[in-house]
Amino acid sequence: MRRFLVLLVVAFISIPFANGRNALNTDEMKMLQDSGGWEILSMSKNQVNGFPTQHPCFDGRPHPGQCSGVLILTKSNTFSQTVRIQGQSVKRTGTYQLNGDQLAFVDELGTQDGPYTLTLNAQTKSLILQMPQIRMELMLESEYRKMLEEQKKRDHPR
């Protein structure tokens, strides 16, 4: 009887974790793993003293030619992140693990990053990755390119 109760408790505790594994549906997973990746729009963090800071290159507005960042998540659970700031480029690669709405990275040096809480909005084609210290807002790269083209047409009509 005691063993049965232990198994019952273990099964009961495991239910939320089993359900959490499928936080994204099939279409959302396809979007998350889009081959074009995700453009980093904004990146902000809370310092230890509690004052939020915003990275000047990633302030929510496009800065083509000055800075850009793209995160690509593949179906084989690998990632690549390329950040360009004023002609300098930094690339990071590794693996990622998605467990429910938690996304964690391990880069090529074995450095662990995360887990981040993942919020994907399929309608706006946007992605938010956040944990207490940092928040990143991303847009599907193909949508970002469309947005830049539309902005260019508005700013420079023929």
Question: What do these predicted ranges mean?
Answer:
Residues 18-93, 97-158:
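Lipid interaction determinants
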Residues 4-13:
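Sec-dependent N-terminal signal peptides
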